[in-house]
């Protein structure tokens, strides 16, 4: 009897944990991440890169890779642009290779590919990624859904996602 009561209380407490508290545990705030990814602010991107590195996320490579590629488009030196882009691409693609049906990773790649210069030849997965994002939209966490809504307003590939 005591065990059942304990388990009931434990389940009740676990259900009370909010998304914000879960963010604190992992050290990763998806809303802040997507705000940085949407911005053109290198300081904000660097802040998120540091947050990802110090977080307890097990899948940080995809997020770090996307931010590095975004940062590549904002730095001044061509050498730094190429270096950051290549490093970010390796990280994001490695994550997608491990989990190629992960809609959030494909959304990150879609964002980058739609804005990547033709010279870097990184536009091959736009159709696949947009279909995967559209078909899995409802299963994604709410901060990711909000980022998709915001991004779809200016995306050719996600056009028509919203009614």
Residue ranges of each PLM-predicted region?
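Terminal, low-structured helical/coil segments at or just beyond the last alpha-helical repeat
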Residues: 128-163
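Helix-turn-helix repeat elements of alpha-solenoid scaffolds
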Residues: 35-49, 81-89, 122-123
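TPR/TPR-like (Sel1-like) alpha-helical repeat modules
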Residues: 83, 87-90, 121-139
């Amino acid at each position: 009897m005591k065990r059942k009561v304990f388990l009931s209380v434990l389940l009740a407490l676990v259900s009370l944990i909010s998304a914000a508290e879960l963010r604190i545990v992992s050290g990763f705030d998806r809303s802040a991440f997507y705000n940085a990814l949407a911005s053109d602010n290198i300081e904000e991107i660097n802040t998120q890169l540091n947050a990802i590195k110090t977080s307890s996320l097990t899948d940080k490579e995809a997020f770090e890779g996307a931010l590095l590629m975004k940062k590549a488009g904002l730095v001044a030196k061509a050498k730094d642009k190429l270096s950051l882009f290549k490093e970010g691409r390796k990280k994001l693609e490695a994550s997608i290779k491990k989990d190629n049906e992960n809609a959030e990773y494909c959304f990150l790649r879609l964002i980058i590919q739609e804005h990547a210069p033709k010279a870097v030849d990184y536009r091959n997965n736009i159709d696949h990624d947009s279909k995967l994002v559209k078909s899995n939209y409802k299963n994604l966490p709410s901060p990711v859904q909000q980022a998709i809504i915001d991004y779809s307003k200016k995306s050719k590939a996600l056009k028509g996602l919203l009614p």
